[in-house]
Amino acid sequence: MKGMKTLSQINLKQLPLNFCKCGVTGWCLEVIFPSTESILRQDWRVMGQTSLLMFPIYGCGALLGPIGDLIDRWVTPGSGFAAKKADLAIRHGFLYMVLIFVAEYFAGSLLRGRGMCPWDYTGRNTNIDGLIRLDFAPLWFATGLLFEQITKKKGG
């Protein structure tokens, strides 16, 4: 399929840099999102915070793009069908959203078991085991696509 990467074309040398890009971007999002919530509450201190533990969790977002490419190869192998960019964005957005939910749930479970989980959604209407919030689905959809964009090789 034109434009799709093969396994050998996924540049593993870029993975450490992309891991850092996603880790730092995730940290920034963790600070910005609560800051906007504080503005809505008219708390003009505009506070936001994150945990050092979140860096490797967000860093794993570097794997989303390669996973999306592999899924694209699997869904339409050799069909010659060139998917529209909007269709790919929707497919990838939903895929990344689900993968982020799964990663958040399992990372949270592991951290909670060690008394180190920096988040607890208990008491929120859409939480599952206090580890994920289903109302974050649009945020994870967009975050996955953002990670895909910031880790894409320029010109490719």
Where are these regions (language model features)?
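Aromatic-rich, lipid-facing transmembrane alpha helices and their immediate juxtamembrane interface loops
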Residues: 1-156
